[in-house]
Amino acid sequence: MGAGANNHEESSPLIPAAVAAPAYEKPPQAPAPEAANYYADGVPVVMGEPVSAHAFGGVPRESWNSGILSCLGRNDEFCSSDVEVCLLGTVAPCVLYGSNVERLAAGQGTFANSCLPYTGLYLLGNSLFGWNCLAPWFSHPTRTAIRQRYNLEGSFEAFTRQCGCCGDLVEDEERREHLEAACDLATHYLCHPCALCQEGRELRRRVPHPGFNNGHSVFVMMPPMEQTMGRGM
């Protein structure tokens, strides 16, 4: 009886049949957002840390803003500055070199510490050998520093890209850098005034002059106004 009653209750139409709950399907998870890539001085930065070119499979290097033979630069907002750079490179390369170093490594006495040795080597080379053969040896590391800081394409890499040869040398970062440094030296010896002018045009488009106070605000203290004591009524 008990078993029959239980079976009758289970089969009664008044008791709703138990419905199996549908299996809960976990919604697909959205892919984690990739870290934003930013660029600092021409080198990609992930999560605030600069990474090497190998981490991204080779970072394409930028071209110089103007060619080495573009004496008057480009017809843009820096046109007057390009003319000034051309005149300095022709008449007073020591001043142009000192200005380039001052923009590249701003600091007290940077201009004098670079301009004066360059002037001495310039005069010594012209006096002993009849041409400026000593100052390029002194100034070519600046070109290497500009190229590395702003991730610019070097002369050797540009040559291999145009000719399609020596690709293995470009892939080897250390060997490529040695070859680029040698090309920087050769560029200064063969086209020294043009190399200085190209570096000057590049730096003036990227770095403001240190004399502009680098954008810091200047507070001027005004003297107090004269105060007079009046006689009360």
UniProtKB/Swiss-Prot annotation:
Membrane topology (UniProt): Multi-pass membrane protein
Record-annotated membrane-spanning stretches: 85-101, 115-138
Compartment(s) of residence: Membrane
Tree of life domain: Eukaryota
Tissue specificity comment: Expressed in roots, coleoptiles, leaves, stalks, apical meristems, immature ears, embryos, endosperm, pericarp, silks, tassel spikelets and pollen. Highest expression in the pericarp and stalks.
Keywords, ordered alphabetically: Membrane, Transmembrane, Transmembrane helix
Keyword Transmembrane included in the entry's annotation: yes
GO cellular component: membrane
Family: Belongs to the cornifelin family.
Protein name: Cell number regulator 8
Lineage: Eukaryota, Viridiplantae, Streptophyta, Embryophyta, Tracheophyta
